[in-house]
Amino acid sequence: MSQADLLDQDPVFQLKGSMLAVTILELAHNDLARLERQLADKVAQAPNFFRDTPLVMALDKLPEGEGRLDLPALLEVCRRHGLRTLAIRAGREEDIAAAQALDLPVLPPSGARERPLDIKDSAPRKPAEEPSPSAGEARPEPAKAEEKPADPVSRPTKVVKTPVRGGMQIYAAGGDLIVLAAVSPGAELLADGNIHVYGPMRGRALAGVKGDATARIFCQQLAAELVSIAGNYKVAEDLRRSPQWGKAVHVSLSGDVLNITRL
């Protein structure tokens, strides 16, 4: 076997699934001038957080009747403020065509996978008619099936006992994340459920990353770069204004508002 054959048997790549924290910008109005001003104000609050931030541009919430969207100009506005658009989420044909012309991936609209199937070919079947009982014949009562109580659903909990250093990312899939040590700046915690940090929280904490608005974040010392629940977040510049900065706190979500309270 030649050296070239041996090299061909050594794979040069791997395809892996990964849970990445990607910012979604949901455009509510087709008004690029207003977007430029508001985005500049937001980026000024946390310039380091928004620098080279990967972004999914969501156009599926745009109201009808606001005209054709200038997608290249929209992407340029985001680029000027450090946001790098990876993909477009859209449902309108003109937006999808514009994204494809720019060679941008197009994601399905929010909630598209949850829509019920529309099966048009199958007609409802008519139930078979049962013979009516003759006079004086008693109809037997159907037997009642015993109701079995539902088994309790337990969610797996991921426990980390060592410090989480900058550059590390820890994800608790399907459950809660408990960290029994400090979390350094630049570290990232993600969980489908709650996040508990029994030490200083100086990195990023993203709970309910798959949309669970009931998720919570608990930490003994709030000094985070970012806290997020179900996509609603606050960065360090916002958190420092809170009287709870540096204290033991509980973070919860009410509507679209993050509430930070003392433990």
Curated annotation (Swiss-Prot):
Keyword annotations: Cell cycle, Cell division, Septation
Keyword Cell cycle listed: yes
Name under which the protein is recorded: Probable septum site-determining protein MinC
Assembly behavior: Interacts with MinD and FtsZ.
Gene Ontology annotations of biological process type: cell morphogenesis; division septum assembly; regulation of cell division; regulation of cell septum assembly
Region span, Disordered: 107-159
Compositionally biased spans, kind Basic and acidic residues: 112-129, 138-150
Cited function: Cell division inhibitor that blocks the formation of polar Z ring septums. Rapidly oscillates between the poles of the cell to destabilize FtsZ filaments that have formed before they mature into polar Z rings. Prevents FtsZ polymerization.
Organism: Pseudomonas aeruginosa (strain UCBPP-PA14)
Pfam entry (one): MinC_C
InterPro entries found in the cross-reference section: CAP/MinC_C (IPR016098), MinC (IPR013033), MinC_C_sf (IPR036145), MinC_N (IPR007874), Septum_form_inhib_MinC_C (IPR005526)
Cited SUPFAM superfamilies: Cell-division inhibitor MinC, C-terminal domain (SSF63848)
Top-level taxon in the UniProt lineage: Bacteria
Similarity remark: Belongs to the MinC family.
